[in-house]
């Protein structure tokens, strides 16, 4: 719902600085609500609306956390190089953002079913991980139930989208490691290390059933 590119689904736009959230769709008139994030303050505005519970949304996708951090840097230091104190401010703001959005799934009146953070990927010391600067790159995995690495695998039947959900090291040199984790363990039991053509609604259903059955 926040930033990212338009999808093939029915799309509407929303400016949280000007209006309240759109009414619930009637007869499938819209499926995705898109918010253009041009400054970090917009992220706070969206959260404030979501936290009221007075909205029609079931899920939130932030695309991408890498870009949101850049917007946060713009707010903290503009075009200047970040000082040590400003790096600290950046970490606090970004950690608050991640945790506050994540906690929307526990909202007492209108819990969000799923909050998804997308990010670009970069290699750090031989490990492929989210392209997030500073200490947040270390703490981020601890804030979420699932950290995955999404890629496309070419097969005889054509390209297949796959989501890695457990740590993995490539067999060929330079033996790159891929950072991933499934804190629920339920998804790993169902899919193994890779989810082919991942469907978030299906994965949520499996997670909920696994947690219910213990």
Language model segments and positions:
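Glycine- and charge-rich intrinsically disordered segments
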Residues: 191-214
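Intrinsic-disorder-associated interaction segments
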Residues: 36-39, 83, 193
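Generic structural hydrophobic/aromatic packing signal, biased to beta-strands
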Residues: 2, 60-62, 101, 147, ...
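P-loop NTPase motor core
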Residues: 59-139
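Phosphate-binding/switch region of NTP-binding enzymes
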Residues: 113-189, 194
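Conserved, well-folded catalytic cores of nucleic-acid-processing
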Residues: 49, 67-71, 143, 147-150
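Conserved P-loop
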Residues: 1-61, 66-67
């Amino acid at each position: 719902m926040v930033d990212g590119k338009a999808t093939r689904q029915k799309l509407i736009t929303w400016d949280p600085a000007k209006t309240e959230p759109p009414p619930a769709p009637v007869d499938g008139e819209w499926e995705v609500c898109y918010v253009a994030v041009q400054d970090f303050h917009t992220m706070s505005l969206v959260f404030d609306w979501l936290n009221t519970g007075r909205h029609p949304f079931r899920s939130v996708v932030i695309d991408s956390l890498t870009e949101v951090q850049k917007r946060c840097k713009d707010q903290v230091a503009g075009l200047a190089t970040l000082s040590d104190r400003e790096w600290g401010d950046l970490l606090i703001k970004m950690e608050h953002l991640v945790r506050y959005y994540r906690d929307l799934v526990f909202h007492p009146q209108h819990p969000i079913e799923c909050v998804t953070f997308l990010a670009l990927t970069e290699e750090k010391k031989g490990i492929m991980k989210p392209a997030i600067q500073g200490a947040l790159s270390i703490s981020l995995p601890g804030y979420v139930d699932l950290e995955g690495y999404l890629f496309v695998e070419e097969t005889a039947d054509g390209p297949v989208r796959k989501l890695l959900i457990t740590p993995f090291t490539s067999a060929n040199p330079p033996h790159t490691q891929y950072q991933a984790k499934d804190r629920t363990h339920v998804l790993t039991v169902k899919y193994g290390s890779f989810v082919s053509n991942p469907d978030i609604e299906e994965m949520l259903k499996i997670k909920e059933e696994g947690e219910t059955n213990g």
